[in-house]
């Protein structure tokens, strides 16, 4: 009898929990009948798995295509365990980005905070974010066209590109390389030099890179902190990187002025940031400079590898620039300004590749925009890829056509937000473009290439080439 009562009590508790789960999931639908059309999916899971299902990054994916056709370009869903408004509309996206901290606020999932740290520029809010971003902008502005920075980019690009010659010494001999790995080597070497003043061959650089790779894997993993999981390894890797950076900071302080002119020198001269904020700033700089730049370069190589006509136009542009320079003379800021078609290619690769698909925001109050009501506290996802691939805004939207940028604005606009927008526009976006252009200069003047097999950029939603973008490279007979 007692056993039966216990079973009955357990069933009642279980049913109560299930009822609570169902009510908490669907109650926002009942309380907000004027929210945009849409669906919430199953309790607990919502529609997150479908939203995150992998698809080619130059497509919307089945989830967005289905929901946009059924509900329109703005709809409600239940994503990341939260009632959500998804915007695929350029005007609403612009409105959201421009009203940061007034109507909307950055709202990344809590596990991201655990990896990046509470002082990361990606997750801090209000005045703290403004202070960190102003410092980042000042550093980027002073660095962007500095001869020493441009020289460092070129030396590293020459080192990477030159290393391939050793693998295929005979003219005409084809060699296959995993290009994404090479792009990451280049991007990491550049950013670690600019931020910490470290050269690629220093042992501490290799140590930071090893930890950084573990950090990156965990950043995009399931947030389960159990020893051995990618997430746990990422948290541990961040702690090791922080310890290494703190050691470098202490060494600089003890040695006095280093005159290296890197980001760290500027950080150490600032009294506005705590040591923890300085370490987080270094990590943010490494993350942005490494992942964004390497992916951008890989996208450019991928799309040019499929367009012989555009590749030839880029090659001619760089041959013209190189013909006006001495044999071993480095590129200058004036040379960069002449890379006009290269800029068209970079912008088109960003538009088609969609390195940043969407960002996380939260409504701070009930927001009415045109016919839409966005309820207070709901997550808001402005989807940039949906605007980039909208055929009404970009003709033949899924086609790689750099010529569409001729005579057009080269910067961020309502219909082109590859690095976000508003007060949270990525401060290092211009550095990524400079580095991509300089790397491309030496690539097109020294090699011809083609994609080896089928490999496409996939959105998970983070973007990745499944096979690491293997390319067949062949040295050109006339090297520059």
Swiss-Prot record:
Involved in brassinosteroid biosynthesis. May catalyze a C6-oxidation step and may be involved to supply 6-deoxotyphasterol and typhasterol. Involved in internode elongation and seed development. Catalyzes the conversion of campesterol (CR) to (22S)-22-hydroxycampesterol (22-OHCR, 22-hydroxyCR). GO terms for biological process: brassinosteroid biosynthetic process; brassinosteroid homeostasis; skotomorphogenesis. GO terms for cellular component: membrane. It catalyses: campesterol + reduced [NADPH--hemoprotein reductase] + O2 = (22S)-22-hydroxycampesterol + oxidized [NADPH--hemoprotein reductase] + H2O + H(+). Its EC number is 1.14.14.-. Its cofactor is heme. The chain crosses the membrane at residues 6-26. Disruption phenotype: The dwarf11 (d11) mutant shows the erection of leaves in mature stages, the shortening of the grain length and of the second internode in culm, and aberrant skotomorphogenesis. Treatment with exogenous brassinolide rescues the abnormal phenotype. Induction: Down-regulated by brassinolide in wild-type and the dwarf11 mutant. PROSITE patterns: CYTOCHROME_P450 (PS00086). This is Cytochrome P450 724B1. Pfam families: p450. Pathway: Plant hormone biosynthesis; brassinosteroid biosynthesis. Its main location: membrane. Heme binds at residue 426. It is an enzyme of class 1 (oxidoreductase). GO terms for molecular function: heme binding; iron ion binding; monooxygenase activity; oxidoreductase activity, acting on paired donors, with incorporation or reduction of molecular oxygen. It comes from the Eukaryota. Keywords: Brassinosteroid biosynthesis, Heme, Iron, Lipid biosynthesis, Lipid metabolism, Membrane, Metal-binding, Monooxygenase, Oxidoreductase, Steroid biosynthesis, Transmembrane, Transmembrane helix. Ubiquitously expressed at low levels, but preferentially in the internodes and the florets before flowering. It is found in: Membrane. It is a single-pass membrane protein. Belongs to the cytochrome P450 family.
């Amino acid at each position: 009898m007692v056993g039966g009562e216990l079973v009955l009590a357990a069933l009642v508790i279980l049913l109560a929990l299930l009822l609570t789960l169902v009510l908490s999931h669907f109650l926002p639908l009942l309380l907000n009948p004027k929210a945009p059309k849409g669906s919430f999916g199953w309790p607990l899971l919502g529609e997150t798995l479908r939203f995150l299902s992998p698809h080619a990054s130059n497509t919307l994916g089945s989830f967005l295509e289905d929901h946009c056709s059924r509900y329109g370009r703005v709809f409600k869903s239940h994503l990341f365990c939260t009632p959500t408004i998804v915007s695929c509309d350029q005007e609403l996206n612009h409105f959201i980005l421009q009203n940061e901290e007034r109507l909307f606020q950055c709202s990344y999932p809590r596990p991201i905070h655990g990896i990046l740290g509470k002082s990361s520029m990606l997750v801090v809010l209000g005045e703290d974010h403004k202070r960190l971003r102003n410092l980042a902008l000042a550093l980027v502005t002073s660095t962007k066209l500095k001869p020493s920075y441009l020289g460092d980019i070129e030396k590293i690009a020459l080192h990477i590109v030159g290393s391939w010659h050793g693998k295929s010494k005979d003219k005409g001999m084809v060699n296959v390389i995993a290009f994404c790995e090479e792009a990451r080597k280049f991007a990491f070497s550049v950013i670690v030099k600019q931020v910490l003043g470290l050269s690629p061959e220093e042992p501490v650089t290799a140590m930071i890179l090893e930890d950084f790779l573990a950090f990156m894997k965990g950043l995009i993993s399931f947030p389960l902190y159990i020893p051995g999981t990618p997430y746990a390894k990422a948290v541990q890797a961040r702690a090791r990187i922080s310890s290494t950076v703190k050691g470098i900071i202490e060494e600089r302080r003890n040695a006095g002025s280093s005159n290296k002119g890197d980001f760290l020198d500027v950080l150490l001269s600032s009294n506005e940031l705590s040591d923890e904020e300085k370490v987080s700033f270094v990590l943010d700089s490494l993350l942005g400079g490494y992942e964004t730049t390497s992916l951008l370069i890989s996208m450019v190589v991928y799309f040019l590898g499929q367009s012989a006509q555009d590749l030839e136009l880029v090659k001619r542009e760089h041959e013209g620039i190189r013909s006006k320079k001495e044999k071993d003379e480095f590129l200058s800021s004036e040379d960069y300004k002449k890379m006009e078609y290269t800029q068209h290619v970079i912008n088109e690769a960003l538009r088609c590749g969609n390195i940043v698909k969407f960002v996380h925001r939260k409504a701070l109050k009930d927001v009415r925009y045109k016919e839409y009501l966005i309820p207070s506290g709901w997550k808001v996802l402005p989807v940039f890829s949906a605007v980039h691939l909208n055929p009404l805004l970009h003709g033949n939207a899924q086609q790689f056509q750099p010529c569409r940028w001729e005579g057009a604005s080269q910067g961020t606009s309502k219909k082109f937000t590859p690095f976000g927008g508003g007060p949270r526009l990525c401060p290092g976006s211009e550095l990524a473009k400079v580095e991509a252009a300089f790397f491309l200069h030496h690539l097109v003047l020294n090699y011809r290439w083609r994609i080896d097999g089928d490999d496409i950029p996939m959105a998970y939603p983070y973007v990745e080439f499944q096979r690491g973008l293997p390319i067949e490279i062949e040295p050109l007979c006339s090297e520059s």
